[in-house]
Regions:
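Transmembrane beta-strands of outer-membrane beta-barrel pores
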Residues: 3-9, 49-53, 100, 111-115, ...
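Transmembrane beta-barrel wall of Gram-negative outer-membrane proteins
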Residues: 20-121, 137-151, 437
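Short loop/turn motifs that connect adjacent beta-strands in outer-membrane beta-barrel proteins
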Residues: 36-41, 102, 157-160, 241-251, ...
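Surface-exposed extracellular loop regions of Gram-negative outer-membrane beta-barrel proteins
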Residues: 117, 122, 261, 365, ...
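Outer-membrane beta-barrel signature, preferentially recognizing the C-terminal barrel domain
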Residues: 134-151, 370-373, 427-428, 457-515, ...
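Flexible glycine-rich, low-complexity coil/linker segments exposed to the extracellular/periplasmic environment
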Residues: 190-217, 278-365, 525-554
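C-terminal beta-signal and adjacent terminal beta-strands/loops
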Residues: 271, 275, 645-653, 673-725
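Gram-negative outer-membrane beta-barrel transporters
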Residues: 512-514, 531-650
Length: 725
């Protein structure tokens, strides 16, 4: 009984080299709880105020194949970005419960309000366009969420019932995201055009660097709103069944019904061409006048060197491997964006409509709305045969209906002002029966065997099934495959568990998965009228063009996935002092997988089609995962050193072997410490994360020294104080 008060206060540090607000991380968590009215009524109230600095430095590059050469790559573009990212968040929780004579009523409420601000300074190099861009972008996303759950649990004469009803609502709003870029043309990159095996760092080193010859290209902004609401109700019943002296059973059955409604709309504005275009001269001169610079009708260039922030430095960007130049002044760029937004009508009256106007294509093409309905029911039994054998058979029905409206359109040279499109709504039902069986045999107190057969499904991300089609002017079609089936996995598991005072808990086991309808991103070609199934329904594709289709597909072949897992948790209490405080946790998983990715490259006729199918690992599946932690406990002090290792992961599918990508192997070390203090239940703690500065990295599979992406967050640390009264 009585009230209990907990309080946590934490400060944090971000170790990335070029972060200016390294010590601005904090977290404060007060909570109070108690029981009243003879312990029947309980209250729990908690708040969480948090600020996190999540700045990162990134590298990315895009590659292509050189004609029909299957062994060399061509570098298309390279990009470097410095991304200061600040996330402010406030969470609140109120949980009320009332104990009945044979059950409990519980009412839970959780709320979250967060703001994420990102400033993006970037440089990009386009080899085909022989151009070098400097960009600055800003985004502010307001995310609000609330979840309410009412549950009723009660034991009737023989049946136990659990009823639950929940509601959740979330909305993400970006009131004014913007970006602006300068460019230099030519940029000294012609020598790399369509050349084989060019290291992307060579492109960066060769680019011509001169801020006075790099001029304003374009500005853009957008505002968006994305709401989502869900309702869910469920009920479960348990009934004991007596089947004899040595056999007891419990039957459990129930169901769930959930509805979801979501939508997205965006309004986008920007420059249709470039501020250096003669048609936008009027707008360029207005900008020059606003900036207080001399106006010359014959020289409307707006050079980058007017906007350089001399107080900002990129520091040791990605360990000094790449260099970024000329950081743009945030306040000057923001001021210019606001000027363009306020002067949109004046630009048009000067004949410079394309300098800044509503972009009808981007304001339309990604909008959507939709509903989802999930209904499920199950029945299962827990059968105990004596003290050693437990059998749990069951079957589950799950139906899932999606109904989404998306945009289908044809791009054209005037799509900026008038996008040719239609809205399409498609409804799809996906019913499944999912049987399962679990068996546990415990021949000894210190050993048991667990076997399981199960069927699981993984639904495609809703963004991939919205019936959107985006046909470009260059025979490239982005086609959302609304007929995607969920991936299904038939699973077999066998695990042996040992538990003994000195051994601790040791589990050794294996698993086998047969995956059908594996979902993965894909591009393929379709000549002329063969592209009809992927093209706009109100017109035909051009017969003389060979279309490239970008989409997600199901693999119609079965993917086999095998694995071995070892988990050991122990405390060396039996060793002599001071070693008796050591604790150890280890987990190793080895996975062997093979997937066949079918692909036919379309020729001019079916007779000239080329089968370029290939076999590789299961996408997004590492071969080796190893988690290790070693700790030491002594009275109120503890320290834990942990390591996470993950082997490279097959992450990019392509019919061209040299364009397939994998993540680089990842290894991260962390340290956690805590010390109980002798006053008021105080505890001091600290965490040091990623102390070896591991980076997220993907590379070309055939050329593991050639990066496709790199993301560096640096080391982080927290120190805090907990109070329990």
């Amino acid at each position: 009984g009585g009230l209990k008060f907990h309080f946590l206060s934490q400060k944090g540090y971000t170790g990335l080299a070029n972060v200016s607000n390294k010590y601005d991380n904090y977290k404060v968590v007060p909570s109070i709880e108690g029981r009243f009215f003879k312990e029947r009524f309980g209250v729990f109230i908690q708040a969480n105020l948090e600020k996190r600095i999540l700045t990162s430095n990134t590298f990315s590059a895009s590659y292509n194949n050189k004609s029909d050469d299957a062994s060399t790559y061509v570098t298309n573009s390279v990009s470097l970005s410095h991304l200061p990212r600040v996330k402010d968040r406030v969470n609140a929780a109120i949980v009320l419960d009332y104990r009945l004579s044979n059950g409990k009523i519980r009412f839970s409420n959780f709320g979250n309000s967060g703001i994420t601000e990102v400033t993006n300074r970037s440089e990009s190099f386009n080899i085909g366009g022989n151009s070098h861009f400097y960009s600055m972008g800003y985004s502010k996303s307001n995310l609000n969420m609330i979840t309410n759950t009412l549950s009723f649990e009660n034991q009737f004469s023989k049946a136990h019932m659990n009823f639950k009803f929940s509601h959740s609502y979330s909305e993400s709003e970006s009131p004014n995201n913007w970006s602006l870029n300068f460019y230099r043309l030519p940029a000294g990159l012609n020598d790399f055009y369509n050349q084989a095996n060019i290291d992307p760092s060579s492109v960066i080193d060769a680019a011509l660097i001169n801020s006075s010859e790099t001029n304003l290209n374009g500005v853009s902004s957008n505002n968006s709103f994305t709401p989502e609401r869900k309702y869910m109700t469920s009920m479960d019943l348990k009934i004991p069944v007596n089947l004899g002296i040595k056999i007891s059973a419990e039957i459990k059955f129930g169901g769930k019904y959930r509805t979801s409604k979501r939508s997205h709309r965006i309004e986008s504005f920007g420059t249709t061409g470039t501020f250096q275009s003669p048609s936008e001269r009027g707008a360029a001169l207005m900008v020059i006048e606003y900036l207080g610079k001399p106006v010359n009708f014959w020289s409307p260039d707006i050079p980058l060197n007017w906007f350089i922030d001399s107080t900002f430095t990129y520091g040791d960007f990605l360990d000094g491997k790449y260099e970024m130049h000329y950081p743009l002044d945030f306040h000057m760029i923001e001021d210019l964006i606001f000027f363009c937004q306020d002067t949109i009508d004046a630009f048009a009256s000067e004949g410079s409509t394309g300098a800044y106007a509503r972009n009808n294509y981007w304001s339309t093409t990604n909008n959507y709305s939709g509903d989802e309905i999930l209904n499920a029911a199950y029945i299962m039994a827990t059968i105990n045969v004596g003290q050693k054998l437990t059998i749990i058979p069951g079957i589950r029905y799950q139906g899932f209906q999606t109904s989404y409206k998306g945009v289908r359109g044809q791009q054209s040279p005037i799509s900026f002002y008038n996008y040719d499109h239609t809205d399409t709504t498609i409804t799809v039902d996906r019913p499944f029966w999912l049987p399962n069986l679990n068996v546990r045999y415990k021949p000894f107190k210190w050993f048991d065997i667990r076997m399981a057969y199960s069927n699981t499904i993984s639904y495609p991300d809703f963004n991939t099934i919205i019936p959107r089609i985006d046909a470009t002017t260059s025979a490239y079609v982005r086609w959302n495959n609304y007929n995607l089936n969920p991936s299904q996995s038939e699973n077999l598991d066998l695990y042996f568990t040992f538990y003994e005072n000195k051994i601790g808990l040791l589990t050794i086991g294996g698993f086998k998965k047969e995956i059908t309808d594996l979902i993965y991103p894909w591009r393929f070609s379709a000549p002329g009228l063969a592209a009809i199934p992927y093209y706009l329904t109100d017109r035909l594709p051009a017969e003389h063009l060979n279309y490239t289709i970008e989409t997600y597909i199901n693999n119609h072949l079965v993917v086999d996935n095998y694995g071995l897992e070892i988990d050991w948790q122990t405390h060396f209490w039996y060793l002599p002092k001071p070693f008796n405080g050591l604790v150890l946790n280890m987990n190793y998983t080895h996975v062997q997988s093979e997937a066949h990715y079918p692909y036919v490259y379309a020729g001019a006729t079916s007779a000239t089609n080329v089968d370029t199918s290939f076999t590789d690992r299961l996408i997004y599946q590492p071969n080796h995962i190893f988690n290790f932690s070693m700790g030491y406990d002594y009275k109120g002090f503890s320290i834990l050193v942990s390591m996470l290792y993950q082997d490279d992961v097959f992450s990019g599918v392509s019919q061209w072997q040299q364009l397939r990508s994998t993540t680089a192997e990842y290894k991260r070390w962390d340290i956690a410490l805590k010390q109980d203090l002798p006053w008021l239940g105080l505890q001091l703690y600290s965490n040091f994360n990623n102390i070896n500065n591991a980076k997220d990295k993907s590379v070309l599979q055939m050329y593991p020294d050639i990066p496709k992406s790199v993301e560096d967050y640096g080391m982080t640390a927290q120190i805090g104080l907990r109070l329990k009264i």
